[in-house]
Amino acid sequence: MTRWVQTFLLLVAVIRSYAEDSCPDVKVIGVGASDKLTILRGCPGIPGVPGPQGPSGPAGAKGEKGFPGIPGKMGPTGLKGERGISGPKGQKGDKGDPGIPVVGMAQNCKEWLDQGASISGWYTIYTTNGLSLTVLCDMETDGGGWIVFQRRMDGSVDFFQDWISYKRGFGRQDSEFWLGNNNLHLLTVTGSFQLRVDLTDFGNNRTSASYSDFRIAAEAQNYTLSLGTFTGGDAGDSLYGHKNKGFSTKDRDNDSSPASCAERYRGAWWYTSCHSSNLNGLYLRGNHSSFANGVNWKSGRGYKYSYEVSEIKFRPQP
């Protein structure tokens, strides 16, 4: 065997032993009957060093606008800014048109009576400007139809009140109350009204006094009392001398006396200097030793007797 053949066989054996793990590839190419050419291809070499970056290509066309992203969470509330400077005061507006009077609704207890109501109690009435009021209607006394605006009966309510309280009204529907001077003005500002005072002493003796042309002025005139004449009643007249006087309270002195009559006689009334009646005075339960500071009616039981029940009421004048 020639040396060339031996070399060839050795190469074949080596190739078989590393066929699965090595990369060389051996090819035998026949040239002639007696000559063979062997080609051995080796493994790939180590990668070379990367070449330099080529020049940038031209900019691509602008893409379409994407969809809006999900809104983020609201941030924390910022600090409150300082109050700005007040602007100039605007001009006073024009006076509005008068409201439409309420049609078909009772404006006093007499109208309720005319519509068939016959039981004394609390009813809703309307002033000429449409204000609704709940009032006590006396449907029995002297033909009925009276609005009761003052009642004393048990001493459960303090009547030594200030101006604002008498303006707005106070008390309880089931016992003692004052309807309110502002309401009295609104209810008597139009028309003519009769006034009636009903008194009951602790012996259950009942007396009364009546007057014509009752009216109460506005607050700007201190709720001045207007009266016509004394028209009768067995209690006698202890109010006519108070006509044309403003209303006085412990904190608003409109009387003719150097001192406050309201403070001195513990009440609130159309005092002169000072009074012949004091039906908003202290509830002293009959005879009392103090002078003129009870629920007094001079022409009735005098200055030292405080009545058990007092009711002051009015209705349209026939």
Swiss-Prot record:
Q: Name one GO cellular component term.
A: collagen trimer
Q: Which UniProt keywords apply?
A: Calcium, Collagen, Disulfide bond, Glycoprotein, Immunity, Innate immunity, Lectin, Metal-binding, Secreted, Signal
Q: What is known about the tissue distribution of this protein? A: Expressed in peripheral blood leukocytes. Also detected at lower levels in spleen and lung.
Q: Which Cys pairs does UniProt list as disulfide-bonded? A: 109-137, 261-274
Q: Which residues are glycosylated?
A: 205, 222, 254, 287
Q: Which residues bind Ca(2+)?
A: 253, 255, 257
Quote the Gene3D superfamilies the UniProt record gives. Answer: Gamma Fibrinogen, chain A, domain 1 (3.90.215.10)
**What does the UniProt record tell us about how this protein is modified after translation?**
N-glycosylated.
The Collagen-like domain covers: 42-99
The Fibrinogen C-terminal domain covers which part of the protein? Answer: 100-318
Signal sequence span is 1-19
Broad class of the protein's primary localization: secreted
- Which domain of life does the protein's organism represent? Eukaryota
Does the record bear Cytoplasm in its keywords? no
Task: Kindly give the SMART domains that the UniProt entry links to this protein.
Answer: FBG
What GO molecular function annotation could you give as one example from this UniProt entry?
antigen binding
- Give the matching PROSITE patterns: FIBRINOGEN_C_1, FIBRINOGEN_C_2
Family to which the UniProt record says this protein belongs: Belongs to the ficolin lectin family.
Self-association and partners = Homotrimer. May form higher-order oligomers.
Domain text = The fibrinogen C-terminal domain mediates calcium-dependent binding to carbohydrates. The domain undergoes a conformational switch at pH under 6.2, and loses its carbohydrate-binding ability.
This chain belongs to the protein called Ficolin-1-B
- Native organism is Xenopus laevis (African clawed frog)
Report the gene name: fcn1-b
